[in-house]
Amino acid sequence: MEEINKELLQQFRPPAFPGSFFISFEGIEGAGKTTQINRIKDYLEDKDFRVLVLREPGGTPYGEKLRKAILETSTNIHPVAESYLFASARAQLLTEVVLKELNTPNTIIICDRYLDSTIAYQGIARELGVQRILETHNVFPLHLVPHRTIYVKIDLETSLKRQEMRNNPKDYFESQDHSFHQKLIDGYDLASELFPERISVVDGKRDFDEVYLSIRQQIDDLIFKKED
């Protein structure tokens, strides 16, 4: 296992906006992130929170253009280029949207993918190394991380079955081979070990209602514990 600088890990902290929260969802294809994000959004709005749902890459005009260019490309992108493209989109999302919106009290931002996807995709699956990814992000605003990350974990077999059931066209990353997707799981598992206080691992193979209740409990623990 790659040795990660512990002092570097300590540089990654959530933004400080009393009464507002930044939450991310992670997982491989077929984990059901989108379904759970939508349900959690409805739940939080019922609790009178102002909820914004963002995605990575994306969330800004610049980020959405990068997303389209990356996911629709028919040529291989160099791993270093991938890494910096995602970091670029993330920096813009943070400055243009996240930090401004969190300044409004009672706001919750939910982001579909964030830093841990870069750790999994470029750090592990593309073999750039996690240390390099973290060093790239050790600068404002990229060192800012969510208050809580929900990692909806499924195995490769479950992912492939669910993708087959959806029968959707595959994008740049979805079309990679099985070994790539197994490395993604390894990458997310490693991220969970590196940031255990931030990342909550939820078993995504269960019934969607059971998964939802587990996630809701994690969200409640974050929000209402912090309010106390």
What are these regions (language model features)?
Residues 33:
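Conserved lysine of the Walker
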Residues 18-22:
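Pre-Walker A (Motif I) flank of P-loop NTPase domains
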Residues 30:
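Walker A (P-loop) phosphate-binding loop of P-loop NTPases
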Residues 36:
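Hydrophobic positions on the alpha1 helix immediately C-terminal to the Walker A/P-loop
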Residues 118-186:
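A glycine- and Lys/Arg-enriched "phosphate-lid" helix/loop adjacent to the NTP-binding pocket
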Residues 1-16, 41, 157-228:
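NTP-dependent small-molecule kinase module
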Residues 25:
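Hydrophobic anchor at the beta1->P-loop junction of P-loop NTPases
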Residues 47-141:
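ATP-dependent small-molecule kinase phosphotransfer cores
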